[in-house]
């Protein structure tokens, strides 16, 4: 009998299966979820408040498939921890634990590789293999939590891949993260990042959930964005912004935009003013990210240019910050996942 990964199941579907297919009482669902998501116990035999018969039924029908930690690197600068995780089919993904003074964040992947091939991002250079299953996405968080012996209260879908191209599985993982009997994370502590898939951004608005949306913009014009983000040929800047307006009208929530600053390319005061004009009356927050080491050889602007860009946005009524760099010494910063793996493979 082929067993199913229990991490693929939302609460209601799991309860229904346990009740109708295995004959387990309803309250057993809560006990099983507590063992997996709260206590991080990943074998049924250790679930001691279940009867031996129930444990056998679970083992016969389910597996708890957690990615194997192949490699772990810890930043000597800030403690950021990057994991190389192996899936059952031997494909690998990377995920990261990031520490801030007020919170700890798990950055998780949604695809093996990425099809978008943004020129400043290492993940896209490794090619695209497939979407991750619901259980494979959730499993990254559980593997890191067990290794760190801690509960992570903030999750960002900013690892490898484009989350909105794996829409159904990503939404299902959010239900699992948010459910009070499963991970019980507050929806506002969950952020989906996207390179800008207009139809899917609007669908996120239709969900009417409290999780946050972050859009990777990185340039104020199509001429610039075309050069660094091939997806812009299909979904130009204006279309992305319009979908964000529709999202905001539906949800009443502010949209966060990620903007990588590249020396001599998109870092001038004129670029900042074009950004202000592009946003118009859209309520936004802009995270400015000085570009990290990347396959295209792009360089960071000087601190003076970064500050001038920030000041121009703020003076024109745009909420903006320069995002603190984390994990750059272990290639765990924005756009760097899979960098070292690629370098080692090419030696």
Curated annotation (Swiss-Prot):
Compartments in which it is found: Cytoplasm
Misc: Reaction proceeds by a ping-pong mechanism involving intermediate methylation of a conserved cysteine residue.
Known catalytic reactions: adenosine(2503) in 23S rRNA + 2 reduced [2Fe-2S]-[ferredoxin] + 2 S-adenosyl-L-methionine = 2-methyladenosine(2503) in 23S rRNA + 5'-deoxyadenosine + L-methionine + 2 oxidized [2Fe-2S]-[ferredoxin] + S-adenosyl-L-homocysteine; adenosine(37) in tRNA + 2 reduced [2Fe-2S]-[ferredoxin] + 2 S-adenosyl-L-methionine = 2-methyladenosine(37) in tRNA + 5'-deoxyadenosine + L-methionine + 2 oxidized [2Fe-2S]-[ferredoxin] + S-adenosyl-L-homocysteine
Record-stated family: Belongs to the radical SAM superfamily. RlmN family.
HAMAP family per UniProt: RNA_methyltr_RlmN
NCBIfam families hit by this protein: rRNA_mod_RlmN
Organism, as annotated: Petrotoga mobilis (strain DSM 10674 / SJ95)
Domain of life of the source: Bacteria
Enzyme Commission number(s): 2.1.1.192
Active-site positions on this chain: 94 (proton acceptor), 334 (s-methylcysteine intermediate)
Residue numbers binding [4Fe-4S] cluster: 114, 118, 121
Disulfide bonds: 107-334
Bilayer-spanning residue ranges: none
PROSITE patterns the UniProt entry points to: RADICAL_SAM (PS51918)
Lineage: Bacteria, Thermotogati, Thermotogota, Thermotogae, Petrotogales
Gene Ontology CC terms, in alphabetical order: cytoplasm
GO terms under biological process: rRNA base methylation; tRNA methylation
Domain Radical SAM core: start-end pairs: 100-319
Record note on cofactor: Binds 1 [4Fe-4S] cluster. The cluster is coordinated with 3 cysteines and an exchangeable S-adenosyl-L-methionine.
Name of this protein: Probable dual-specificity RNA methyltransferase RlmN
